[in-house]
Amino acid sequence: MSLKEQLEHLQQKSLQDIQKVVDLDALNQIRVEVLGKKGPITEVLRGMRDLSNEERPKVGAFANEIKSDLAQAIEARKAELEAKKEAAQLAHETIDVTLPGQPVKKGTPHVLTQVIDDLEDLFIGMGYQVVAGFEVEDEKHNFEMLNMPADHPARDMQDTFYITKDTLMRTHMSPNEARDLESHDFANGPIKMISPGRVYRRDTDDATHSHQFYQMEGQVIDKNITMADLKGTLEYTIHHIFGEDRDLRFRPSYFPFTEPSVEVDISCFRCNGEGCSVCKQTGWIEVLGAGMTHPNVLKAGGVDPEVYGGFAFGLGIDRFAMLKYGVDDIRNFYLNDVRFLNQFTQEV
C-alpha cells in the first residue's frame, strides 16, 4: 500500500471515529491521537524518506490537506457536542417564569440623612438655597473672613486638621457663608442659604464627641433684618423637629462671627423643664448657636454693613438626631450596626 493510500485510509477511519464520539473528552483524545506528533499520520510520513524527489512534495502537500480536513472535522464535531450539552443543560434547568419572584428588599436612608433631608425640605420651603461647599478649605474662608484672626485659638494645630500650612479640613460650615457673601449680587435679591455637611475637629471620640460629624449652618443677609427674624426662624425650625410642645430659651453668648450672639436651649424631653440628670438639673438642653452677622464678616465679604445686615445660625445634625431619637452615644451613627439602624427605617 502506497503512502498516499495509507493516508487516505487513516483519513476515512479518523472521520468515522470523530462522528462516533459522544463527549468532548473523547473528541479531544482523538485530536491528540490523530494529529499529535506521535500520531499515525506522522508515523506514515516517516516513509517519505524513501520517496523520490518528485513524489515527496506531492505526498507532503496531500498529508497537510488531510490534517487540515481532520482538524476542521474535529472543530465541527466539537461545536455539535457543545450545542447538545448546552441544550441538555437548559432543558434540565428550565425556569417557570409564571412562578412569583422574591421581592427586592428596599434600602432606607441613614438616620442622619433623614434629619438632613427633613431640614433641607423645611428651609427650601422658606425660600432658602442649599449650598454644599468644600470639605478641604483655606484659612481665609474658614477663619479670616469669619472674624477669626491668626491668634484665634480655633486656628491652633491642636484643634484643626491641617493638610498644608494654609489648607485644612473645614472645622464648620461657615466657610460657605463667607464664599456666598463674596460672590453674591444683591441685585438678584437677598442671601438665604443653608449648608449641611461634614466637618472635622481634633476631638477624641467618645459618647458625645467625634473627630468627624455633621453640621448645618445658615444665613440670611438683606436690608432691615432683625433679631426678631432670627428668633422666628429658629422657633419654627425647632418646633418642626422636636414638636410644638418644646419651650425655647435664648441665652447671650459669644461667637466671633456674630454680634450679638445667642445660644438656644429647649425644654428637657424627660422632665419637661423640672430638672433631671439628662438636663443636669437645669430643665434646659442646648441645641444650637446663632446671632446677628458681625459687621467685620460683612466687610470681609465686600458687603456694606451700613446698608445690609443679617443673621446666621449653626446646629449639629448628629446632636439633633441624638436628642430627637434618644440616642446616648454619637458613635452609634457610624458603626453601621444594622440592629441600631433598623430602628430608623423610612419608606423611600
Swiss-Prot record:
Q: List GO BP terms, alphabetically.
A: phenylalanyl-tRNA aminoacylation
User: Which segment of the chain is annotated as a signal peptide?
Assistant: none
Kindly state which keywords UniProt assigns to this record, in alphabetical order: Aminoacyl-tRNA synthetase, ATP-binding, Cytoplasm, Ligase, Magnesium, Metal-binding, Nucleotide-binding, Protein biosynthesis
Cofactor: how bound: Binds 2 magnesium ions per tetramer.
Q: Give the protein's cofactors.
A: Mg(2+)
Is the keyword Protein biosynthesis assigned to this protein?
A: yes
List the GO cellular component terms.
cytoplasm
According to the UniProt entry, its GO molecular function terms are:
ATP binding; catalytic activity, acting on a protein; magnesium ion binding; phenylalanine-tRNA ligase activity; transferase activity; tRNA binding
Q: What InterPro entries does UniProt report for this protein, alphabetically?
A: aa-tRNA-synth_II, aa-tRNA-synth_II/BPL/LPL, Phe-tRNA-synth_IIc_asu, Phe-tRNA_ligase_II_N, Phe_tRNA_ligase_alpha1_bac, Phenylalanyl-tRNA_Synthase, tRNA-bd_arm
- Matching Gene3D superfamilies: Bira Bifunctional Protein, Domain 2
Q: Which reaction does it catalyse?
A: tRNA(Phe) + L-phenylalanine + ATP = L-phenylalanyl-tRNA(Phe) + AMP + diphosphate + H(+)
Keyword Nucleotidyltransferase attributed: no
Return the similarity comment: Belongs to the class-II aminoacyl-tRNA synthetase family. Phe-tRNA synthetase alpha subunit type 1 subfamily.
Can you state the subunit structure given in the record? Tetramer of two alpha and two beta subunits.
For this entry, the protein name equals Phenylalanine--tRNA ligase alpha subunit
Q: Which organism is it from?
A: Latilactobacillus sakei subsp. sakei (strain 23K)
Which gene name belongs to this protein? pheS
